[in-house]
């Protein structure tokens, strides 16, 4: 059997799961793997490889790591590979725009995008799906064009978003959904058995990369909205507020009460309204939010009981979180 020649482009664990599927299928000859450069992470600023690079090195695949594709040495290498014959491009959460000339030369170019397009085009589709309270998310296999995530759709599959899900759990679920969908549909697409369908431009929504401002909790929002924001940013980039003028990260929470604050119940948004040895509750613009896992400035992440037994002893009912 002649293997389909491809160049794979991807960066996080989501992409590594897709790449592993392509490798294990034994249907593809992967000429090169393109991923983001190694980055310094954590307090110690240790240089870390991307999950895609780690996987590629274990199976001796050539790895290219351009800071930016356009005008790079790696771009020239990729063009040489594409011009050598019938070579396609497969991407999954790569994190860079592909120059148009790559799309022209490639035999085909398909992307594994973690949303139910045309909803949530952009770099943070899973985050926004959860933050917006969606009940399901999914993956779309799509043709790549010069416009971001706007190509025709080859296939799509969905999975529920549960109350206990966060960005981390959904990334993991959708990685396997994407892997299986790509492996199932790519051969059929290349054989002409599947015809790509245009996206409905009237239904397009966007999910741009999360800005630092977006990470801040607005306590005037409802408890339900803040709950969705917290899980829509866990484990990264993590929603935060201020306590005593310092950053206070919130990883997990739950809606304790969705009552409407009114004149008979004049709670101030961001105010601590209940504190016991095991729980901490905060008023919002509409309802009460219970904090479950937090990280005070300069401290490790901890469950709320550990916080209340330590630094949290200084926190009192009536204190206010936020600006």
From Swiss-Prot:
Pfam families: Formyl_trans_C, Formyl_trans_N. Keywords: Protein biosynthesis, Transferase. Attaches a formyl group to the free amino group of methionyl-tRNA(fMet). The formyl group appears to play a dual role in the initiator identity of N-formylmethionyl-tRNA by promoting its recognition by IF2 and preventing the misappropriation of this tRNA by the elongation apparatus. Its EC number is 2.1.2.9. It catalyses: L-methionyl-tRNA(fMet) + (6R)-10-formyltetrahydrofolate = N-formyl-L-methionyl-tRNA(fMet) + (6S)-5,6,7,8-tetrahydrofolate + H(+). GO terms for cellular component: cytosol. Belongs to the Fmt family. One of its GO terms (molecular function) is methionyl-tRNA formyltransferase activity. NCBIfam families: fmt. It comes from Lactococcus lactis subsp. cremoris (strain MG1363). (6S)-5,6,7,8-tetrahydrofolate binds at residues 115-118. PANTHER family: METHIONYL-TRNA FORMYLTRANSFERASE (PTHR11138), METHIONYL-TRNA FORMYLTRANSFERASE, MITOCHONDRIAL (PTHR11138:SF5). The keyword Cell membrane does not apply. This is Methionyl-tRNA formyltransferase.
């Amino acid at each position: 059997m002649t293997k389909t020649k491809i160049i794979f482009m991807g960066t996080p664990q989501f992409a590594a799961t897709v790449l592993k599927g392509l490798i294990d299928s034994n249907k593809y000859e992967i000429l090169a793997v393109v991923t983001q450069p190694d980055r310094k992470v954590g307090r110690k600023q240790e240089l870390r490889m991307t999950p895609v690079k780690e996987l590629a090195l274990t199976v001796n695949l050539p790895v290219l790591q351009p800071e930016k594709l356009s005008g790079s040495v790696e771009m020239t290498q990729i063009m040489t590979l594409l011009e050598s014959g019938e070579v396609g491009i497969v991407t999954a959460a790569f994190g860079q725009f592909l120059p148009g000339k790559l799309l022209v030369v490639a035999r085909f170019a398909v992307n594994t995008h973690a949303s139910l397009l045309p909803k949530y085009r952009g770099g943070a589709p899973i985050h926004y799906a959860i933050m917006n309270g969606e009940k399901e998310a999914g993956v779309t296999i799509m043709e790549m064009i010069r416009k971001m995530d706007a190509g025709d759709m080859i296939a799509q599959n969905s999975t529920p978003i549960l109350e206990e899900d966060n960005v981390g759990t959904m990334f993991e679920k959708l990685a396997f959904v994407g892997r299986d969908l790509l492996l199932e549909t790519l051969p059929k697409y290349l054989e002409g058995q599947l015809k790509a369908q245009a996206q409905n431009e009237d239904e397009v929504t966007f999910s741009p990369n999360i800005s630092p401002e977006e990470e801040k909790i607005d306590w005037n929002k409802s408890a339900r909205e803040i709950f969705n924001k917290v899980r829509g940013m866990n484990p990264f980039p993590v929603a935060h507020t201020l306590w005593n003028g310092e950053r206070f990260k919130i990883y997990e929470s739950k809606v304790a009460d969705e009552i409407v604050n009114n004149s008979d119940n004049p709670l101030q948004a961001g105010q601590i309204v209940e504190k016991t040895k095991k729980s901490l509750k905060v008023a919002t613009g509409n309802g009460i939010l219970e904090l479950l896992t937090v990280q005070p400035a300069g401290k490790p992440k901890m469950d709320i009981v550990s916080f209340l037994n330590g630094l949290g002893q200084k926190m009192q009912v009536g204190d206010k979180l936020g600006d």
